[in-house]
Every structure is written in structure tokens, then in C-alpha cells.
Amino acid sequence: MKFDYKKYFINVSSFILYLFPASLILSTFLSNLFVTIISLSFLFYIILRKTKLPENIFFKLFIIFWLYLILRSLFAENIFFSVRSSFFYIRYIFFSFAIIFIIENNKYFLKNFLKIFLVTLSILLIDSFIQFLFGTNITGISAKNLEDGRISGLFGKELVLGSFISKIIFLLLSVFCLTKINYQKSIFLGTFFFSVIVVLISGDRSPFFITILLSLILLTLLKSFKLKTKIIFSLFLVSSILFTIYSSQVIRDRVIKHTASQLINDSSSEIKIHKLNIFSKGHEAHYIAAYKMFKDNIIFGQGPNMFRLLCKKNEYYVEPQSCSTHPHNYYIQLLAETGLIGFSFLMALFLFIAGNLLFKKLSNFGILISLSLMLNLFPLIPTGNFFNSWVANLYFLSFAFYIYGIKTKLLFK
């Protein structure tokens, strides 16, 4: 009997993708392993079947971007360190197109993926509420042992709960629109509501504020719900947010007082307006250091992932807080490390997504998956490292569904 690699690849990769959301919570190593297995298996399938590489404009542009990263790394001050970040970045585009291939060839994938994804998120949300209400989650992690008494849920000591939920919630809701399940609207609204509340109690302020902003856009554009339902839901959500903030001293201090104190550098007993900071004193120092690197090589930058090595140099040093593994903003990082050329790829992608959302008639799926990517790539908030694998795992998952929507025309009405 002839071995059917296509069937084998689809079945194994589908199973891995069902577990992928959980792997993002439990282990960065595991999620990276899953991405590598799927991308290499898909590449092997292409070679084995002697099929053409995806003839898609996004695929071609990504390859050009990747080749540029490799080339720039070869001229970086620390070639090995820079190449190590850029060379393996290629796996993400094969990961995204493997997902598209699986969706198209496994008619049960979307429903199974949605159900398992929903169960995974529900467990995470319940655990987070337990930690918030009782101080300790189901794995024994106490909020008292975390910074400012924040909530981390199943992420343990990693304070990324709010960031994770904000990045996946619109993706999950978009998959709702591709499937038909019983009580879809009730589950949709319930998942959305509890996710926003957990982002709030996590203490992750940037994800919370951007989630609220995009939620307003969502409720404005979404056509599935009557105006009355939208108004009632919005009032209930706002009331719940205000109640949560003012009933918890920890959240109130974190969301309101801490935000104000970081935005305003109060070095004396009086608050002086001329000492306003960009997000915080530390963030501003990162951005200034990155700007110095950008000015030093406007077109090509300093090389992928080189910020952490160069920020200690006298010509880029600002103050002790200015040096970090990355400048905490994707766009500023790409300007510093890849110059205007690398920056233009990401900015063009964001403007393309935003342009479609603003000027074209999108389906409910199109609206949600667009918001998912915009939240992942929003330029005006602090972010992680652009070349960080955990971060890339998240936005290339959303990217796969976005390309699928364009390819099948499900993105548009």
C-alpha cells in the first residue's frame, strides 16, 4: 500500500495545531517546536510532491523581506548573533501557509480547532479569576509573589496574561464566523466579555487600552448584532470594568495611578507638565537609544536583533534604563536594526490591513481577523521583541487566517 504523505501531513499537523494555543501558554519551547515541525513538514511536502511554492504576493514579499534580513545580518557588527535571529525567521511563512493548506484540505479542522481553542481559553480565564479572587491559582502561583500583585494565571511568573489574551481573542472570535455552532452569539459575547475583564485584572495596561479601543471599532462595524444588543452589551461591559477598577485597590493603582506616574516623570514633589514621558521614563530612553542607532544608518539600520548589543556603546547610550534586549516597539526596533527598508515592509502591511478595514466592505470574519492583526502590529504601543519567537508565533497564526480570508474572498462581503 502506497504511503499517502499528504493525508499523513494533514492529520498530524491538524492535531498539532489543535494543541498549539495550549502550547503558547505552557511552553515557549513546545510552541516553537510545533511551528518548526509544521513548517518543515509542509516544505517537505512541497519538495516531495514537486509542487510550486505558494504563488501569493504575501509569500513573495516575505521572502524578499527575509533575504534582506539575511543580507543585513551579514554586515552586522556581530554577524553570528544577528544571522541567528534572521535566518530561522523563514519558518513562519511556511507555518502560515501550512495552516491555510490544512484548512482547505481538512473540512473538520475549523470546528475542531475552535472547540479546543475555546476550551483552552476558558480554562485560562477560570484560572485567572481564581487567582484574582483567592490570591492563588490552580497551579499554586500566588499573586503576592508577582510584581505589584499582578495576575499571571497559567503563565506562572511570566506577566504576559493580558498581552496573550488581547492578541488571541479577536482571532478566536473570527474563527466563530467561519463555523456554525449552536448558541454562537451567546458564546461569542460571553467569551469576548470575560476576556476583556481578565485583560483588565492582569494589570497589562497597554493590551487593555488597545483592546478597549479595538472593541469600540468592532462593536461599531459588526453587523451580526442588533443595535439594542450592542448598546446593552457595551453598557454592561463598561459598568463591569468601572466596578472592577474601583472595587480593587491593586487594579486602581496599576491602571490609573501607575499609568499617570509613568507618563509624568515626577522627580520632585510637584508634577510638572514639561516632564511628560513617552509611556514611561524607561520606554522613552529605549526609543532615544534606538533613534540614535537609526540616525547612524538610516537606510539599512544596525542589523537584526543588534539593539541589545549596541545600546551599551557610548554613541547610543542614554542612561541605565535605555539598554534592554529590544526597544519595546516593533517599528522603532525595525528602524534601528533594519533601517527604512526593513521598516517599510511592516508599515506597508499594517497600512494595507488598516486600509481594508476602513475603506472596504469586510465580512464579520474580515473585521475580526483584521482587528486581530492590527492589535498584534499596532505601532503606537509598547511591544515585545519583533524577532521573539513567542510573539511571532502569535501574529503569524493570525496572519495565516488573514491570508486565507483574502484567498477565499471570505474577508470581504
Predicted regions: what they are:
Residues 1-84, 101-111, 115-118, 175-186, ...:
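Transmembrane signal-anchor hairpin modules in multi-pass inner-membrane enzymes, especially those
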Residues 20-21, 66, 70, 94, ...:
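Alpha-helical transmembrane segments of multi-pass inner-membrane proteins
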Residues 126, 222-273, 288-296, 304:
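A membrane-periplasm/extracellular boundary helix in multi-pass inner-membrane enzymes
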Residues 270-338:
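Long extracytoplasmic/lumenal interhelical loops at the membrane interface
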Residues 337-362, 396:
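Selective detector of the "anchor" transmembrane alpha-helix that sits immediately C-terminal
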